[in-house]
Swiss-Prot record:
Belongs to the TFB2 family. It comes from Yarrowia lipolytica (strain CLIB 122 / E 150). The keyword Repressor does not apply. Component of the 7-subunit TFIIH core complex composed of XPB/SSL2, XPD/RAD3, SSL1, TFB1, TFB2, TFB4 and TFB5, which is active in NER. The core complex associates with the 3-subunit CTD-kinase module TFIIK composed of CCL1, KIN28 and TFB3 to form the 10-subunit holoenzyme (holo-TFIIH) active in transcription. This is General transcription and DNA repair factor IIH subunit TFB2. One of its GO terms (biological process) is nucleotide-excision repair. It comes from the Eukaryota. The gene is TFB2. Component of the general transcription and DNA repair factor IIH (TFIIH) core complex, which is involved in general and transcription-coupled nucleotide excision repair (NER) of damaged DNA and, when complexed to TFIIK, in RNA transcription by RNA polymerase II. In NER, TFIIH acts by opening DNA around the lesion to allow the excision of the damaged oligonucleotide and its replacement by a new DNA fragment. In transcription, TFIIH has an essential role in transcription initiation. One of its GO terms (cellular component) is transcription factor TFIIH core complex. It is found in: Nucleus. Its main location: nucleus. InterPro entries: Tfb2_C, TFIIH_p52/Tfb2. GO terms for molecular function: ATPase activator activity; double-stranded DNA binding; RNA polymerase II general transcription initiation factor activity. Transmembrane segments: none annotated.
């Protein structure tokens, strides 16, 4: 998991009241998951305390840390205090007894309270293997990503998924449908593990509005991260909240159930890697591919870049993935598609199209850099500086020119009439543009009706004076 999203889930936990965290720490599986999410120094300090019956002296902690790392030590202790794992006196550091007891139970296998799930004790007549679970997870997750980038694959995510995408700000309503937002494009830049945590954090936020117990929700998420891939688990130990969650998580590809009424479920690799230290991977399919290989080198290869960008703005993408091609289509004018490659051109219109849809120049540059071909990453500049500068200039151009709907007033009888009416528009604060020499000005649409009424009153007053 990436450090960015570790911080996000930790930030969420740090914001919880002590009473809620104490309830969370009653689950050994949750204690183990929280422990895995902590930075290395925090884990070291905790391991030095959970098998020690006495509080640890502050001086002993200081002795464990180099003088040059004192700032890191203070930050770590602050994090552990916010998580209510540590409390400190002037002389000692005391570990939360509930956390201590249940983390120790998780580490030594003393958990008797089924927090790590209940494996089914009967054989599944429709048992599935790991390859099937991987394919199912890829299919469900990439369906969501395809929908976000506007690729038609014949299937649409469930209403629950669509509501979550809107609630999280990854997509927004437009013309009866949904379109990807700036945050949504940033979401596509993350590895699949980080993407899942993004949606799960938003799910946690939504659960509060739905009056779901956040402790139940978190315990289930952390439990999923500790389950065994390929093992089927019983629903008998799940609360009603967790059974409801299971229905939602099926739609994300995090768990598999053959049918809604099934009394068993299988965690997929998207679930079992939630709290793991697996290297970040860029897509669900690459994650599955790398996870099933025997060597580290294959994992690295699965994540190698595929984009070559030339100084003439021509782009070559060595990919067969419809999803990656659809993402490129958001800011590249694609020209030709071959069996394992697409070509295209980055130009003013394609970048302006992306900018108008909320994607920033920096995000485009980041995407191209992250997915650059190894040959490009070996050069002095990963991307041609001229291309990078031009993409930024196109955004500056968009920032300078803003389109605003307005109402044009012209053909005044004389300059006095023009001046009276334009002055009135200024006083109302609805004047957008004026050209006194040509006796023209533009007002906002909202203020145009008031100006029309003013012109009518002025003309009527002048006619009355003439009579």
């Amino acid at each position: 998991m990436t450090s960015q999203f570790k911080n996000s889930i930790n930030d969420y936990l740090e914001g919880l009241p002590e009473a809620v965290l104490t309830r969370l720490y009653q689950s050994p599986a949750t204690c183990l998951a929280v422990f895995r999410l902590l930075p290395a120094l925090a884990r070291t300090l905790i391991m030095g305390m959970i098998f020690n019956p006495d509080p640890i002296a502050v001086a002993d902690v200081d002795a464990l840390v180099k003088p040059s790392s004192q700032r890191l030590k203070l930050e770590t202790q602050k994090k552990l205090r916010l998580l209510h794992i540590f409390t400190e006196t002037q002389a000692h550091i005391i570990i939360n007894p509930t956390f201590k007891k249940n983390l120790r139970a998780a580490l030594v296998g003393g958990d008797q309270n089924i927090s790590f799930g209940v494996p089914c004790d009967t054989e599944d007549k429709h048992k599935v293997d790991v390859a099937f679970l991987d394919a199912h997870a890829v299919s469900q997750w990439e369906m969501i990503l395809h929908f976000m980038v506007g690729t038609s694959i014949g299937r649409t995510p469930s209403d629950g998924v669509l509501n979550l995408l809107k609630h999280s700000g990854l997509m927004e309503p437009e013309r009866g449908g949904l379109r990807i937002t700036n945050a949504g494009f940033q979401f596509l830049l993350q590895d699949v593990n980080a993407q899942i945590w993004t949606l799960l954090l938003q799910y946690l936020n939504m659960s509060e509005y739905l009056q779901m117990d956040p402790v139940d929700v978190l315990n289930f998420i952390f439990m999923l991260g500790s389950l065994e891939l390929g093992q089927d688990y019983s629903l008998s130990a799940l609360s009603e909240t967790q059974k409801h969650m299971l229905e939602d998580l099926r739609d994300y590809g995090i768990v598999y159930q053959r049918k809604a009424s099934s009394r068993r479920f299988y965690p997929t690799r998207l679930a079992t890697t939630l709290t793991s230290e697996t290297a970040a991977l860029r897509t669900a399919s690459q994650s599955m591919e790398a996870a099933t290989q025997d060597t580290i080198s294959s994992s690295v290869a699965a994540d190698s870049g595929f984009i070559i960008l030339e100084t003439n703005f021509r782009l070559y993408a060595y990919t067969e993935s419809p999803l990656q091609i659809a993402v490129l289509n958001l800011f590249v004018n694609l020209k030709t598609r071959f069996a394992n490659m697409v070509t295209g051109q980055i130009n003013r219109d394609s970048v302006r199209f992306a900018l108008s849809n909320g994607i920033t120049a920096e995000q485009i540059i980041t995407y191209l850099s992250v997915h650059a071909h190894p040959r490009m990453k070996g050069m002095e500049h990963v991307l041609p500086p001229t291309v990078v500068d031009q993409i930024k200039l196109w955004q500056l151009e968009m920032d300078r020119i803003r389109a605003t709907d307005g109402y044009l007033f012209s053909e005044f009888k004389n300059f006095d009439e023009y001046k009276d009416v334009s002055t009135y528009a200024k006083e109302l604060g609805v004047l957008l543009y004026e050209n006194p020499g040509k006796r023209k000005f533009v007002s906002t649409l909202a203020g145009s009706q008031q100006i029309v009424e003013f012109v009518k009153r002025r003309n009527q007053k002048h006619r009355s004076s003439a009579n």
